């Protein structure tokens, strides 16, 4: 049946929504209604297969699933749902999944309305010329205002919302209406069945037994089991060992016809051969041009990831390679730290992405890790000479080498917030060195603030602070803007007079003292006391800007002296003093793992 389904009866669509607006629940109901998943196998968030996805209530990996639906007009349709993430960090996952669709369901919470993150994904869908169907979800909530949300969709996004589908995925209301809207309003794929094969790779993951499983959308031609295919960028030739669809588990069909979405297995053992966004064509009859318009993933946040036990270094590298297989946006290169030993400098899309990767390394691969404070990429030049890009404070040039010019990346951010919290948001953006651009009133209760902000200020704790200052009501999205010259300095943290490279950070001159002092204070609380005094200092070049001292243990050496000559006691105290001095000069301070973790979690 799948092999002979006509293009006019196929629909490829995605679901766009802000976190918590009910995207995964709608996907669950569609699977249930079309009988793709039996009641026995049904569980919440069925497409969110990772435990982490369920715990955090978010979608991290793109997933594809094929549904078969008999419409009211009596015809059978093949509906390919590509479930995409909704968080700002995973915008690349969204962009490549949207390229495999002709339409998108825009899910908006009837009580919360349009959020900033929804906007970012909708604009991506519009860029890809997708037909967008507005769906107002959670209409059963007491606070639901569907008519107001319709006006918002029209005013803020500029989409007509008269025929928006009203639904409550939780209670199964409006699911049939959604399916009928998909069939009648999303266009069918319109490709050439007789042209040379052209297929888009929109995701891939590594299976321990079968190698790389590649998610593809067939545009022109078709892919059959036994075909010889070629990957465009690497010119690597492969044989298709299996082709099929996700329903929602893998189901072999031996052929993927024009306009279909499914998977192929070619026995490839590394994802570097099947890069996301690449084009597949036939060896016998190749296409003339590859598919255009894919942006490669760009790492925005960098951090060192080190195994707690040096024996785990190789294991960590293998784990990162496997994760990179499923995640084109993760980058890593080996690096060495005096304090932490051998590890990797990893590039992430954002802080949530970093948190998820580190958590997956701990859970799925049982590796105990230490991760350093995240930083961004700076452009540095000395005496206006050649520009160098650095993402690690250790690479920061020495202030004595000449006139240093540093440029840092800025983002253009939009915050949608209830009007009673506008003051709090403006205050936060000013603290984070933001440049005010504009303020628009979306309706009588909400405003949209636009700011330019340094990316470095965003990656640490901006999102958490924004949520706490607006009681969780604000939503935020951003895009990279440009590099600007800033007055930045490198601050070293010295423990017992020795710099600990893992604690070094780059900060704006105005914030260097506060952040340095906060780290010193935190370390003085978590580093255990020793037999000798431990100074903890923050240094800007050779200038100490903050200091905390961990007092030494004092052994009562004169406890055994009962009465007697005072000189005897003095002699013992002098001997103790000498011993402590010698201990201090040769003693090594053991820095516990909690110290690294507490500095990472430290909020300004």
From Swiss-Prot:
Keywords: Cell inner membrane, Cell membrane, GTP-binding, Hydrolase, Membrane, Nucleotide-binding, Protein biosynthesis
Keyword flag Hydrolase: yes
Any Pfam family: GTP_EFTU_D2
Main location: membrane
Main EC class the enzyme belongs to: hydrolase
Ranges in coiled-coil conformation: none
Topological category with respect to the lipid bilayer: Peripheral membrane protein
Domain tr-type G intervals: 8-190
Function: Required for accurate and efficient protein synthesis under certain stress conditions. May act as a fidelity factor of the translation reaction, by catalyzing a one-codon backward translocation of tRNAs on improperly translocated ribosomes. Back-translocation proceeds from a post-translocation (POST) complex to a pre-translocation (PRE) complex, thus giving elongation factor G a second chance to translocate the tRNAs correctly. Binds to ribosomes in a GTP-dependent manner.
Record HAMAP family: LepA
Protein known as: Elongation factor 4
Source species: Fusobacterium nucleatum subsp. nucleatum (strain ATCC 25586 / DSM 15643 / BCRC 10681 / CIP 101130 / JCM 8532 / KCTC 2640 / LMG 13131 / VPI 4355)
The encoding gene: lepA
């Amino acid at each position: 049946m799948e092999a002979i389904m006509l293009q006019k009866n196929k629909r490829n669509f995605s679901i766009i929504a802000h976190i918590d607006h009910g995207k995964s629940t709608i996907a669950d109901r569609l699977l249930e209604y079309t009988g793709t998943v039996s009641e026995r196998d049904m569980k919440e968030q069925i497409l969110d297969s990772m435990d982490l996805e369920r715990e955090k209530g978010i979608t991290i990996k793109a997933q594809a699933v094929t549904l078969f639906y008999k419409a009211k007009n009596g015809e059978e349709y093949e509906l390919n749902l590509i479930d995409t993430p909704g968080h700002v960090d995973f915008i690349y996952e969204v962009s490549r999944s949207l390229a495999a669709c002709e339409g998108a369901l825009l899910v908006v919470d009837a009580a919360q309305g349009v959020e900033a993150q929804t906007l970012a994904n909708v604009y991506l869908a519009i860029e890809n010329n997708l037909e967008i169907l507005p769906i107002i979800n959670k209409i059963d909530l007491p606070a639901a205002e569907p008519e107001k949300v319709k006006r918002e969709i029209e005013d803020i996004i500029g989409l007509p919302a008269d025929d928006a589908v009203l639904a409550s995925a939780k209670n199964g209301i409006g699911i049939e209406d959604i399916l009928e809207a998909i069939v009648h309003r999303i266009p069918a794929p319109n490709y050439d069945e007789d042209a040379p094969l052209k297929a888009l790779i929109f995701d891939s993951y590594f299976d321990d037994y079968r190698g790389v499983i590649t998610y593809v959308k067939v545009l022109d031609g078709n892919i059959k089991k036994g075909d010889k295919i070629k990957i465009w960028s690497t010119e690597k030739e492969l044989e298709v060992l299996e082709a099929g669809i996700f329903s929602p588990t893998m189901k072999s069909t031996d052929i993927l016809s024009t306009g279909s979405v499914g998977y192929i297995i070619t026995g490839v053992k590394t994802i570097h051969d099947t890069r996301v966004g690449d084009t597949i064509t036939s060896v016998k009859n190749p296409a003339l041009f590859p598919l255009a318009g894919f942006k490669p993933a760009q790492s925005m946040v960098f951090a060192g990831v080190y195994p707690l036990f040096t024996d785990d270094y190789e294991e960590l590298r293998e784990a990162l390679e496997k994760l990179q297989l499923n995640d084109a946006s993760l980058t890593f290169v080996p690096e060495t730290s005096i304090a932490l030993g051998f590890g990797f400098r990893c590039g992430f899309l954002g802080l949530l992405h970093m948190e998820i990767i580190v958590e997956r390394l701990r859970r799925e691969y049982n590796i105990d890790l230490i991760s350093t404070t995240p930083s961004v990429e700076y452009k540095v030049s000395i005496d206006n000479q050649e520009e160098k890009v650095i993402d690690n404070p250790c690479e920061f040039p020495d202030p004595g080498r000449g006139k240093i010019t540093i440029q840092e990346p800025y983002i253009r951010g939009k915050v949608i917030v209830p009007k009673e919290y506008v003051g709090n948001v403006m205050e936060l953006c000013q603290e984070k060195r933001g440049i005010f651009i504009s303020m628009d009133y979306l309706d009588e209760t909400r405003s949209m603030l636009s700011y330019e902000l340094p990316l470095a200020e965003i990656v640490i704790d901006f999102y958490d602070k924004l949520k706490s200052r607006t009681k969780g009501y604000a939503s935020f999205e951003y895009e990279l803007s440009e590099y600007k010259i800033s007055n930045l300095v490198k601050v070293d943290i010295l423990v017992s007079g020795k710099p600990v490279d893992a604690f070094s950070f780059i900060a704006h001159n105005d914030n260097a003292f506060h952040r340095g002092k906060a780290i010193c204070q935190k370390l003085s609380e978590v580093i255990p006391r020793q037999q000798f005094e431990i100074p903890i200092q923050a240094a800007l070049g050779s200038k100490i800007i903050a200091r905390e001292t961990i007092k030494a243990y004092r052994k009562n050496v004169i406890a055994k002296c009962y009465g007697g000559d005072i000189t005897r006691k003095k002699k013992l105290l002098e001997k103790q003093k000498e011993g402590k001095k010698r201990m201090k000069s040769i003693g090594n301070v053991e820095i516990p793992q909690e110290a690294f973790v507490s500095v990472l979690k430290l909020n300004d």
